[in-house]
Regions:
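Periplasmic-binding protein-like
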Residues: 30-32, 105-109, 192-229, 253-261
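Extracytoplasmic small-molecule ligand-binding "clamshell" domains
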Residues: 21-91, 95, 247-251
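Ligand-binding clefts/hinges and TM-proximal coupling segments of bilobed small-molecule sensing domains
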Residues: 138-152, 194, 229-265
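A ligand-binding cleft/hinge motif common to bilobed small-molecule-binding domains
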Residues: 74, 87-95, 174-196, 203-206
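Acidic, polar ligand-binding/catalytic clefts
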Residues: 52, 65-125, 136-139, 202-205
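Extended ligand-binding regions for polar small-molecule ligands
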Residues: 49-57, 129, 211-244
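Ligand-binding cleft/hinge of the Venus flytrap
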Residues: 49-60, 101, 125-127, 136-158, ...
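Alpha-to-beta junction loops
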Residues: 60-61, 77-86, 129, 168-181
Length: 265
């Protein structure tokens, strides 16, 4: 090998080593919330994919840790994670976290059986009904305030699957859930026959925005958030942001079906 080729080879190796060193790792705590966040879906779900790409364009390699939602919050708040995703804004969370620019627009609706002639315009229209709900879950301050008036009863369980099972058994009348999350749970856990029994009311219970939260306990969070927000604004401006959700509607984040095992007989 000539000295010139050796020199060029060393320069290339040095360049690649520098790029690898600059690829910093970000650890982000998340909860399971398919199709937005799920260890079982392609790219860990559409929001995980979006977050990964946003940070990759800023030179970071993102690693997600799926935890129960309360642990995802508390572990990030103490600085064990660089960020946590995704969360509704609540004033009390500002003590622990910086909030990014809005990352996800959600639409919460009431799921119900098609056999139920259900209509609503005001919360009082729900009086006397039994609702399903998620553990420690907020459906927005206005509906939370209505629930506190005890005009309806709400039976909270840990998963969407459990809530839909109760709905099918008529143990609850309504189940408030984010629309894409609800239909993803139905597709994943229920037969086509059971899916066909359930619909949602078109009037949204809540149109909500969710955010990436970065812990105030970490000194670098404000600078990291500024870079994230700038890149997110670029994605929205160029239309790239919308392509992730177009892919979601086309089923591109669904897990690959497991092929049947071949028999030796």
């Amino acid at each position: 090998m000539t000295p010139r080729r050796l020199y060029l080879g060393l320069c290339l190796l040095l360049c690649l080593s520098t790029q690898a060193a600059e690829q910093k790792v970000l650890n982000i705590s998340v909860g399971d919330w398919p199709p937005y966040l799920s260890a079982d879906m392609k790219h860990n779900g559409v929001i995980a994919h979006l977050i990964s790409d946003l940070f990759a364009d800023e030179g970071y390699d993102v690693r997600f840790q799926f935890l129960p939602w309360p642990r995802a919050y508390s572990a990030a708040a103490t600085g064990r994670f660089d960020a946590t995703a995704v969360w509704m804004h609540k004033a009390e969370r500002e003590a622990d976290f910086h909030f990014s620019a809005p990352l996800l627009d959600e639409q919460f609706v009431f799921f119900h059986l098609k056999t139920l002639p259900f209509d609503w315009h005001h919360f009082d229209d729900l009086t006397g009904m039994t609702l399903g709900g998620g553990l420690e879950y907020s459906y927005g301050p206005q509906f939370d305030e209505f629930l506190a008036q005890n005009k309806v009863s709400i039976e909270r369980v840990s998963t969407a699957m459990q809530n839909f099972e109760k709905l099918l058994k008529e143990r609850v009348v309504l189940y408030p859930q984010e629309m894409n999350v609800g239909y993803a749970a139905l597709r994943s856990h229920f037969s086509e026959e059971d899916q066909a029994k359930i619909t949602h009311h078109p009037t949204p219970l809540l149109i909500n925005r969710s955010y990436l939260m970065l812990p105030k306990s970490l000194e670098g969070s404000p600078a990291l958030m500024a870079r994230f927000n700038k890149r997110l604004a670029d994605y929205r401006k160029t239309g790239r942001y919308d392509r992730y959700f177009a892919d979601l509607q086309q089923g591109k984040y669904q897990p690959e079906p497991i092929p049947p095992m071949e028999s030796d007989y």
